[in-house]
Regions:
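A generic structural signal for secondary-structure junctions
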Residues: 18, 38, 92-93
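Active-site micro-motifs of SAM-dependent methyltransferase domains
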Residues: 12, 32, 86
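Arg/Lys-rich, positively charged N-terminal/basic patches that mediate binding to nucleic acids
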Residues: 1-29
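Enriched for short, Lys/Arg-rich terminal
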Residues: 3, 57-95
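Conserved catalytic core of Hanks-type protein kinase domains
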Residues: 16, 32-33, 81
Length: 95
């Protein structure tokens, strides 16, 4: 099984979620990524090397952006989670 590492921004985002069902959907998405990181889509252009997984909840699209570092056991670093609106602009600023 792959090792999942959450960035501090990701940890803060998850901690701030008060809706239990949304938190469960995001945790389920993280479990899917841990089991098989190819479940997301590979990014191109400025974000080459990153992957993202869409989570739909209550008519809102959330993105989980992550990077895979191949080591002895693959390590998946979740860089950022947020709503789709302005997500990639904020991600590029974060990086």
């Amino acid at each position: 099984m792959n090792r999942l590492v959450l960035s501090s921004a990701t940890q803060k985002f998850i901690k701030k979620i008060s809706d239990k069902r949304l938190k469960d959907k995001i945790k389920s998405g993280l479990d899917k990524i841990r089991d098989d990181y190819t479940v997301g889509s590979r990014k191109t252009g400025d974000l080459k090397g990153f992957w993202s997984l869409d989570i739909f909840y209550n008519k809102t699209n959330y993105e989980i952006c992550y990077e895979v570092i191949e080591d002895d056991g693959e390590v998946i670093i979740v860089v950022m989670i947020g709503t789709r609106e302005n997500f990639y602009k904020e991600l590029k600023r974060f990086l």
